[in-house]
Amino acid sequence: DYIARLAEVTRTHPLLKLGISPRGALALCRTAKARAFAEGRDFVVPEDVTQMAEYVFAHRLMLSSKARLNEYTPEAIVAEVLAQTQPPVLSERRA
């Protein structure tokens, strides 16, 4: 759900001509899973998603003319999207 919300924000962002596609969202899901595995977990936490988002999203975004004129970068847009999209809050599991 968090990844889908991030992708949706990119699709409606005023400085983007083209946001993240469903395939881009799936790529973020896969890389977040890989990061979780590398960290020794069999589950993804929001930090996995936020840490991988720039690597997965930045080259997939198409900036608008206004964004390019004002020297925005895809990385800056990804950071903005992450800042304005509330990550899910994890609750502790109870036995």
How should each PLM-predicted stretch be described?
Residues 1, 10-95:
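C-terminal engagement/docking regions of AAA+ P-loop ATPases
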Residues 6:
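Helix-loop-beta hinge of the Bergerat
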